[in-house]
Amino acid sequence: PGGKTFHAADRLHGTGKVLSRDLTEYKTDLIEENKDRMCYENVEVQQWDALVEDESLLESVDVLLADLPCSGLGIMGRKNDIKYQMTQQQLSELAQLQRDILSVIWKYVKPGGEMIFSTCTLNRGENIENIRWIEENTPMRLVSIEDYLPETLKAEQEVRDIYS
């Protein structure tokens, strides 16, 4: 745990601060251990329920990485049993949980800041429908990352059309 946290900290080259939060003490302890082992001084780790608004963060974050709980259907190659355990109701509940969290955390982004919405799933409800929800329920707007991707990761137009 903490891979995205430490990547963000590396990208800051010792400047700024990365706040990494998780609901569970188990994960925050693991992230804290990795932080100490790798000597990251610009990372702070907190156990926090993302459904609870933190007034001290309102409009204060330059970049928010919303790495939310998801079904994991995009990593079935590593966790093959996921497809047999996930029901349609559970998928809907996860998408709703994501929207509930998003309704709280988008407010942390300062004007002109960015929120990166990240999932490891291919589920339309957790991805496309939640992106549409963000656009309909917050002042945030979708920005294409196409220009930032290496050529090998750029999808052909017909593939992009499937997901839009």
Show where each model-derived region lies.
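S-adenosylmethionine
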Residues: P1-S164
